[in-house]
Design a protein with these regions (language model features):
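Short, small-residue-biased leader/transition segments that mark boundaries at the very start
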Residues: 1-3
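Conserved active-site-proximal phosphate/metal-binding subdomains
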Residues: 7, 13-165
Length: 165
């Protein structure tokens, strides 16, 4: 079986990583955290400031409490909101155990809670209880930069890494 047109995502913040993935056969890469704090990003200033203060170790994987309620693993900065999400999962699992709600309703409650938490952080600037989804490259971010400058820097680093190999 041959997989073509594969894109790599997660933890990419430098051009050297891009070069490495391209050499391994990736068709491209996807960066999220790096662009979340670009000058052109609509993210709330407090959301961006939380990223600038963070280290790579602050981005922790989400926890799935109950196998009946799948949670897509994502990294986010640990805060009160991530603790509340874990508590919400326990609460919903309990209502399932008591047969107070159906499975599809339980899953919807989890999805709506987390989607609402992301909006609270990114749009409203609630960095205490909102979801601060961030990859491990968050530790590299120290200030806002224009998208063009970010891309230029990444491409320059990639090209330099490829010519040195």
């Amino acid at each position: 079986m041959c997989i073509r047109d594969s894109f790599v995502a997660g933890g990419i913040g430098r051009g050297q990583a891009i070069a490495g993935y391209l050499e391994m056969g990736a068709a491209g890469v996807q960066l999220g955290t790096r662009f979340a704090c670009a000058q052109e990003s609509i993210a709330h200033p407090d959301f961006k400031k939380a990223f600038f203060r963070a280290s790579a170790r602050d981005a922790v994987a989400s926890v799935q409490v109950d196998p009946r309620l799948p949670v897509i693993p994502v990294r986010a900065l640990k805060n009160k909101g991530s603790e509340e999400f874990t508590a919400k999962q326990r609460e919903v699992a309990g209502t399932l155990d008591r047969e107070e709600i159906a499975m599809n309703e339980a899953q919807l409650q989890i999805e709506h809670y987390w989607a609402g938490a992301l909006r609270r952080a990114v749009i409203d600037g609630d960095v205490e209880t909102g979801s601060l989804m961030a990859g491990q490259s968050v530790g590299m971010l120290k200030e806002e930069e224009p998208v063009a400058a970010i891309i230029e820097k990444l491409m320059s680093q990639s090209e330099e890494a490829l010519t040195r190999r």
